[in-house]
């Protein structure tokens, strides 16, 4: 049987879907549960779980510290997750992938520009409508309109430019390290999933990951 390797994104430990699937209410509990399962899988089955260093590792540890996770959990992260920097100079990526990424990025930028233009038109129209009936104070009109429009703009702009694509160095490092190690990617991120598929990498949704490891362990115990 081929040695099983997994490459973890931060969401593999911290995502809310993971907590719900494990039936726990906070990140401290879910992180500890996941790390215990990872430790058992390593000791009993030689299944290794890797994390890109220092991008994803730093992101994960920072998140756990902010959530006031127990020091013991952080020690487990250091002990059972294999920290490795992707060999960015040696990993070969097909040129077609870069072409698709640039094309996708260009389309998103154009959509973002159209959203910006629409937001400006909506702001001007709302300001005109609000100021016309009773000639409201200029600052009140601007504050009322801008707060509403800016919030709407941020949501639309973020979803258009960042949803379903790689938007950070840690995201890219997860894919590069997984490709280098021939490991399955573990994440709950639409962009990582999409580009993992394009790179021909195995993908495991973060909420399913603990149960997959547990299934391996249960089968081993039955032997």
UniProtKB/Swiss-Prot annotation:
It is an enzyme of class 3 (hydrolase). GO terms for molecular function: ribonuclease P activity. Its EC number is 3.1.26.5. The keyword Cell cycle does not apply. Belongs to the HARP family. RNA-free RNase P that catalyzes the removal of the 5'-leader sequence from pre-tRNA to produce the mature 5'-terminus. PANTHER family: RNA-FREE RIBONUCLEASE P, UPF0278 PROTEIN TK1425. NCBIfam families: PRK04358.1-1, PRK04358.1-4, RNA_lig_partner. This is RNA-free ribonuclease P. The lineage of its organism: Archaea, Methanobacteriati, Methanobacteriota, Methanomada group, Methanococci.
């Amino acid at each position: 049987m081929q040695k099983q390797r997994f490459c973890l994104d931060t969401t593999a430990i911290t995502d809310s879907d993971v907590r719900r699937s494990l039936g726990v209410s906070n990140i401290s509990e879910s992180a500890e549960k996941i790390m215990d399962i990872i430790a058992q899988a390593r000791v009993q089955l030689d299944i290794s779980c890797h994390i890109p260093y220092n991008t994803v590792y730093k992101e994960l540890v920072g998140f756990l510290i902010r959530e006031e996770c127990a020091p013991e959990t952080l020690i487990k992260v250091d002990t059972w997750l294999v920290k490795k920097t992707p060999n960015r100079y040696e990993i070969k990526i097909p040129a077609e992938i870069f072409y698709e990424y640039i094309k996708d990025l260009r389309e998103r930028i154009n959509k973002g520009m159209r959203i910006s233009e629409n937001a400006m038109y909506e702001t001007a129209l709302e300001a005109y409508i609000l100021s016309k009936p009773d000639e409201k104070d200029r600052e009140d009109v601007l504050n009322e309109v801008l707060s509403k429009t800016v919030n709407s703009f941020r949501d639309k702009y973020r979803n258009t430019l960042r949803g379903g694509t790689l938007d950070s160095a840690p995201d890219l490092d997860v894919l590069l390290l997984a490709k280098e190690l021939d490991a399955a990617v573990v994440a709950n991120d639409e962009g990582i999933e999409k580009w993992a598929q394009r790179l021909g990498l195995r993908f495991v949704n973060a909420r399913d990951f603990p149960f997959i490891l547990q299934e391996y362990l249960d089968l081993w115990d039955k032997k």
